[in-house]
Design a protein with these regions (language model features):
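Small-residue-enriched flexible segments
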Residues: 1-37, 41-58, 62-63, 67-71, ...
């Protein structure tokens, strides 16, 4: 069975925080001499180099993956200054492999995705592969093409989940960790296989408002027109703001009123934040929207936002209950990784502790760690996740791993 040790620290100094998190995680392991993977998240103001050096010194050759984000999630609380770490010992017959692709905004996205898949698959010949976990240090241009390249080698229906840890225009850039290295403008991933099973869930809690609209002209993540009118008129119509006030307030307003993209065959709308308005009335979004898409303005309350948490966790647990590993009656253990959009943090604000309470109540005794993100990566389909992988905004996603 999986040996799981999770540790947390909010020490001010990066080195001391990393040391404390490691010792606490080791204390929670049954066998601290056999560690097969380390997974780490820390808040972005820490020195990434200091953390990496500490991990290298104290964990030597243990494969390490993770990154820094705007806030971390632990069983102790939600912290804008902290580090949370999971140390994992695998059961016999379970495997993983880590890899990264770099300079992804300077290279062809499809090629980068394909390169990462090739690296991840190295050493996985004749081993059943089950799941990919991916981290981007920031939102990338050409995200759908990156996924297409990844799936070219992993398979069109291979399940992946992950996160972008900072936004495209963030001044406080995030960093990724892979083994003893620190880097950005990259994607790091881990592929799991063998006697490991998983369940994933993703929900957001936003509901459609008003009638459907047609995206009539786009270029990448920029919507030029909706219903053959300047795209900004969508918000002018529903929110009754004059153009000047709307332009100043839209980034904040779009947290409460994102754009929902209808995906044929899916129950959930795919959310897109609007980050700015161009002078000509085009909307700049946090993620691409294909031309010809049907969209609706979306609305949420704190209550529906929080209700998405147990829904996502229930979805993940439902798949675990039907897994072959579970049906074998083998003695297993499990842990959870949670990703929550920073937009949810900003919406909940003083009620952010409620998000943690919902997570703890819904997961029960399952240990967990997580991070706030600027974008999530997951399929939409509930049934075995055998569908297209999408970049999401404003979602809560959970991955439960059992072995």
């Amino acid at each position: 069975m999986l040996d799981i040790g999770i540790g947390f620290s909010s020490e001010e100094n990066a080195v001391l925080a990393a040391e404390e998190a490691i010792w606490k995680a080791k204390d929670n392991l049954n066998n601290s001499s056999k560690i097969d993977l380390a997974l780490v998240f820390n808040s972005s103001e820490f020195s990434a180099a200091g953390i990496a050096r500490t991990f290298s010194a104290l964990l030597s050759d243990v494969p390490l993956i993770g990154g820094s984000g705007p806030a971390v999630i632990s069983e102790k609380g939600i912290y804008k200054h902290g580090i949370v770490l999971a140390l994992l010992g695998f059961p016999e017959g379970a495997y993983c492999n880590t890899a990264a692709t770099r300079d992804i905004n300077e290279k062809n996205p499809f090629t980068c995705g394909k390169e990462l898949a090739e690296k991840l698959l190295f050493g996985f010949k004749n081993i059943p592969r089950n799941l990919g976990l991916l981290f981007f240090d920031r939102l990338i241009d050409g995200g759908p093409n990156f996924i297409a390249g990844l799936q070219e080698n992993l398979g069109k229906s291979f399940p992946c989940i992950g996160a972008s840890l900072s936004g495209q225009n963030d001044l406080t850039r995030s960093f990724l960790y892979l083994n003893n290295e620190v880097f950005n403008n990259s994607c790091a991933g881990v592929i799991w296989g063998g006697k490991i099973t998983f369940g994933m869930g993703i929900k957001h809690g936003w509901k459609p408002l008003g009638k459907p609209h047609l995206v009539s002209s786009t270029v990448g993540n920029i919507i030029n027109s909706i219903d053959d009118k300047p795209a900004v008129e969508l918000y002018e119509e529903y929110l009754a703001y004059d153009p000047v006030k709307l332009k100043k307030s839209l980034k904040k307003l779009s947290v409460s009123y994102p754009i929902g993209v209808f995906i044929p065959g899916e129950e959930e709308y795919l959310l897109r934040n609007v980050t700015s308005v161009e002078d000509r009335g085009a909307l700049v979004c946090q993620g691409s929207i294909p031309e010809g898409s049907t969209i609706r303005l979306m609305i949420s309350t704190k209550e529906t936002c929080l209700a998405a948490i147990p829904q996502a966790i229930k979805e993940a647990q439902k798949t675990l209950d039907g897994s072959l590993l579970r049906q074998s009656n083998a003695r297993n253990s499990k842990f959870a990784i949670v990703f929550s959009s920073i937009s949810r943090y900003n919406l909940l604000r003083r009620d952010i502790k409620e998000e943690l309470n919902f997570i703890k109540k819904s997961l029960g005794e399952i240990p967990f760690l997580g991070v706030y993100t600027h974008g999530e990566l997951a399929p939409l389909m509930e049934s075995s996740y055998r569908g297209q992988i999408y970049f999401h905004n404003q979602d809560f996603s959970v991955l439960i791993i059992e072995g």
